A protein has these predicted regions:
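Compositionally biased terminal segments of proteins
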Residues: 3-307
Length: 307
């Protein structure tokens, strides 16, 4: 079970059919053990080769969520832990200042695709199984359910998020397939659309879903301009992460950045305005990244010519 908890299951009296099931289970368990050892060796090689490593506590949480089926049922890892995964996917090491966090942010759509099986992944149960002391964080409005879980006295925290609807309601949304409430946030549907598989590297590997690098970068540009003045540090972190990803994409995958920009344009003038403001802000944080994005995105190049 999630958290490595052993569970006994009674499958009936011993019969030839049951004996075959047991034999097949033992064979598959042996094969799984061999696969797990291979993954652990691979992760050790990645660590030795300089891959970005997720801290042990966060990796335990992500493994429990993955084991419970969260990422199979549409959950997407976002935030700084996703940034770490993207670094390994792109074969790069990010600056350490942009990697500091113990916040585990998981986003999902409130409605489920008909292509997904009618299964459930119980997030509160998965966190409880870890026996790390996770407790629900009370909402500011006592009438609303919690959308976060935190270990008392520590910085480790899990936030559950969902795209904000067109009605712009910030009221938590109950998501039945995860047995949890999620906090609606604007611009999130752009980020998690078309998410792709990735791996968290620690002592072993954890398969998860992360945003595409291009959407991750453009989303960071947009939300950096939405941060309140009190969150200036987070805004700077947004810009730093966006600049680093953009620098790589312009050199190696300019087409995917252009496609992601077209997706921004389809969402209207407000989205374009915020994204351009983010591009302007990058010039202060990383002038080279600003030059690169202006060379690839026509709207940024035109704006630079005007200024």
């Amino acid at each position: 079970d999630p958290g490595g908890i052993l569970r006994q299951v009674y499958i009936g009296k011993r019969t030839p059919a049951v004996a075959r099931v047991v034999a097949r289970f033992e064979q598959e368990r042996t094969e799984f053990s061999a696969d797990r050892e291979g993954i652990q060796r691979l992760c050790a090689q990645l660590r030795a080769g300089g891959a970005l490593i997720t801290d042990t506590a966060s990796a335990r949480v992500l493994k429990a969520l993955a084991d419970s089926g969260v990422f199979q049922l549409g959950g997407v890892l976002i935030g700084t832990h996703a940034f770490t995964v993207l670094g390994n996917m792109l074969g790069l090491r990010w600056t350490s200042a942009a990697l500091r966090t113990q916040d585990v942010d998981v986003a999902m759509n409130a409605s489920v695709s008909v292509a997904l099986p009618p299964l459930q992944a119980d997030i509160p149960k998965a966190l409880e199984s870890l026996e790390m002391g996770f407790l629900p964080v009370p909402a500011l409005d006592v009438k609303h359910p919690s959308t976060s879980f935190k270990v008392r006295g520590k910085s480790l925290r899990v936030d559950v998020l969902t795209p904000q609807s067109r009605l712009r309601s910030r009221k938590p949304v109950l998501i039945g397939r995860f047995n949890v409430a999620a906090q609606p946030l604007p611009f999130l549907e752009f980020l998690i659309e078309g998410a792709e598989p990735g791996a968290v590297v620690n002592g072993g590997g954890v398969l998860i879903q992360v945003p595409t690098p291009a959407r991750f970068a453009l989303h960071k540009l947009i939300i950096s301009r939405e941060r309140q003045a009190a969150l200036h540090g987070k805004s700077e972190k947004d810009l730093s992460q966006a600049a680093q990803v953009i620098s790589v994409l312009v050199d190696e995958r300019p087409g995917v950045l252009q496609l992601a920009w077209e997706a921004v344009e389809k969402r209207g003038a407000g989205w374009i305005r915020r994204a351009i403001a983010g591009i302007d802000a990058i010039k202060r944080v990383n002038p080279m990244a600003h030059e690169k994005i202006c060379a690839v995105l026509p709207v940024a190049r035109t704006r630079r010519a005007r200024t």
